A protein has these predicted regions:
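Flexible, surface-exposed loop/linker segments and immediately adjacent secondary-structure boundaries
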Residues: 24-173, 178-262
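C-terminal non-catalytic accessory extensions
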Residues: 246-287
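Bacterial N-terminal signal peptides
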Residues: 8-19
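N-terminal secretory signal peptides that target proteins for export/translocation
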Residues: 1-6
Length: 287
């Protein structure tokens, strides 16, 4: 009986794992300005030719013009200034596929430059689902903005009850202010277009072939502080759940640990790592 049950469960388990296995590492092909990548306890300087695995956090500065990520299927994500994004976020598989990015804040331009459709991205207020074409997305504290530069895309407005979905058409712009329901206009205003990062305004070709068979040794960057990661650590539960394992080495730093302890109520999944004695069963009394 047990073997029969296991044989029935195995295909389901494989299906759940498939989206994570199928999404290849992203390749950095353009770096115009400073950027860093946080891969577990490692902090790296982002450089052209660097491969970024699942759940790697990329951070650009206010002075960064563009960081381009390419996947083998010809899909791309360009990151603009003052942006934080997670590559291939494994905790956010939806509809049998994982998004290319979780955009915590800042600017991203997504495009499908090959035959494959783009898997989209997730931001705090919107889920941009799989599409063909090119989209510009901005995620801010009080505003979310999606412009269908070429083609269209299905959008899901997150954290609304009842759930709200819409189909963004070519040329349209979607704007959502804070947690209110968003609106769609037939085209962006000149003021909106002026906000688009200048690095997004030119059509850039795929460059992955230039890095074929080239090994890039990543330079180490300064280890992230609690303040650097705070917005991630107190973010969505699906993203936070693996962080105690992924960032365990960082908790050995006194200042980082102090930040975790101070804000433990915002990320309680860290408690077993910080205070393992609270989860140890008391020894049985002698008889």
């Amino acid at each position: 009986m047990y073997l029969v049950s296991l044989s029935r469960l195995l295909p389901l388990l494989l299906a759940l794992l498939l989206p994570l296995q199928a999404r290849a590492a992203a390749l950095v092909t353009i770096v115009d300005g400073a950027a860093s990548a946080i891969d577990g306890s490692r902090a790296l300087v982002v450089a052209e030719g660097l491969k970024l695995g699942n759940d790697t956090i990329v951070r650009t500065t206010a002075a960064t013009t563009l960081v381009r990520l390419e996947w083998p299927d010809g899909t791309v994500a360009d990151l603009g200034p003052d942006t934080q994004a997670m590559v291939n976020p494994g905790g956010l598989v939806r509809g049998g596929s994982a998004p290319a990015l979780y955009l915590l804040r800042g600017w991203a331009k997504l495009a499908s430059l090959g035959s494959a459709g783009h898997p989209g991205l997730v931001a705090p207020r919107v889920d941009v689902q799989a599409f063909k074409g090119a989209l510009v997305v901005m995620a801010g504290a009080d505003e979310t903005w999606v412009f269908a530069e070429a083609g269209g895309a299905p959008l899901l407005e997150r954290d609304l009850r009842p759930a709200s979905s819409l189909a963004l058409k070519n040329g349209e712009v979607y704007v959502r202010l804070a947690a209110a329901k968003g609106s769609v206009a037939p085209r962006p205003t000149p003021a909106q277009m002026q906000r688009v990062p200048r690095g997004f305004r030119d059509a850039l070709p795929l460059r992955a072939a230039a890095f074929k068979d080239k090994a890039v040794t990543a330079k180490t960057a300064a280890a992230p502080t609690y303040a650097d990661l705070r917005d991630w650590l107190v973010g969505e539960t699906a993203l936070r759940r693996p962080f105690p394992r992924r960032f365990a080495a960082l908790a050995r730093d006194g200042a980082f640990r102090a930040g975790l302890v101070e804000h433990l109520a915002r990320h309680p999944e860290w408690e077993p790592l910080l205070f393992p004695e609270r989860f140890t069963k008391p020894a049985a009394a002698p008889r």
